[in-house]
UniProtKB/Swiss-Prot annotation:
<keyword id="KW-0687">Ribonucleoprotein</keyword>
<dbReference type="InterPro" id="IPR000754">
    <property type="entry name" value="Ribosomal_uS9"/>
</dbReference>
<comment type="similarity">
    <text>Belongs to the universal ribosomal protein uS9 family.</text>
</comment>
<dbReference type="InterPro" id="IPR020568">
    <property type="entry name" value="Ribosomal_Su5_D2-typ_SF"/>
</dbReference>
<dbReference type="InterPro" id="IPR023035">
    <property type="entry name" value="Ribosomal_uS9_bac/plastid"/>
</dbReference>
<keyword id="KW-0689">Ribosomal protein</keyword>
<dbReference type="InterPro" id="IPR014721">
    <property type="entry name" value="Ribsml_uS5_D2-typ_fold_subgr"/>
</dbReference>
<dbReference type="Pfam" id="PF00380">
    <property type="entry name" value="Ribosomal_S9"/>
</dbReference>
<protein>
    <recommendedName>
        <fullName>Small ribosomal subunit protein uS9</fullName>
    </recommendedName>
</protein>
<dbReference type="GO" id="GO:0003735">
    <property type="term" value="F:structural constituent of ribosome"/>
</dbReference>
<dbReference type="GO" id="GO:0022627">
    <property type="term" value="C:cytosolic small ribosomal subunit"/>
</dbReference>
<dbReference type="GO" id="GO:0006412">
    <property type="term" value="P:translation"/>
</dbReference>
<dbReference type="GO" id="GO:0003723">
    <property type="term" value="F:RNA binding"/>
</dbReference>
<dbReference type="InterPro" id="IPR020574">
    <property type="entry name" value="Ribosomal_uS9_CS"/>
</dbReference>
Length: 130
C-alpha cells in the first residue's frame, strides 16, 4: 500500500531542509524529534507552522523534515519554505495565498564575507586623523 506524500525543498542562509507532507493529524517531526523538542525558541516553532496556518491545514497533514547546516533560525526558515512548496504541490490553488504571505520566495540574503584589511565584512579599524 503506497502512501501519498508531497515533497518540498527549502533553503535559508546555509541551512537546507527536505520536507515530506503526508495526510495525518498534525504531527511535525524534525530530524526524528518532535517540533517542540527540536526548536527551543517559540519563534522558530511559530515560523515552521506559518504555512500550515495560512493553508488552514494545521491538523490535516503530518510533516517530516530533515535539516542540515546553519543555525536554528536558518533551519526554521528552510523548513517553512519546504512546507510551503509541498503544500503548493499538493494543491496548486494555495500558490496565491502562499506568495501573498511571502512563503514562496527564497530569502537570498547570505552572510557577507570578511575582507582583508577590515575587522569584519564592512567594519574598518578606527580612523585617527592625527
Amino acid at each position: 500500500m503506497a502512501t501519498t506524500q508531497n515533497y518540498g525543498t527549502g533553503r535559508r542562509k546555509t541551512a537546507s531542509a527536505r520536507v515530506f507532507l503526508r495526510p495525518g493529524k498534525g504531527d511535525i517531526v524534525v530530524n526524528g524529534k518532535p517540533l517542540d523538542a527540536y526548536f527551543g525558541r517559540e519563534t522558530s516553532r511559530m515560523v515552521v507552522r506559518q504555512p500550515l496556518e495560512v493553508a488552514q491545514a494545521g491538523n490535516r497533514f503530518d510533516v517530516f523534515a530533515t535539516t542540515a547546516g546553519g543555525g536554528a533560525n536558518g533551519q526554521a526558515g528552510a523548513i517553512r519554505l519546504g512546507i510551503a512548496r509541498a503544500l503548493v504541490e499538493y494543491d496548486e490553488t494555495l500558490r496565491g495565498s502562499m506568495r501573498a504571505a511571502g512563503f514562496m520566495t527564497r530569502d537570498a540574503r547570505e552572510v557577507e564575507r570578511k575582507k582583508v584589511g577590515l575587522r569584519k565584512a564592512r567594519r574598518a579599524t578606527q580612523f585617527s586623523k592625527r
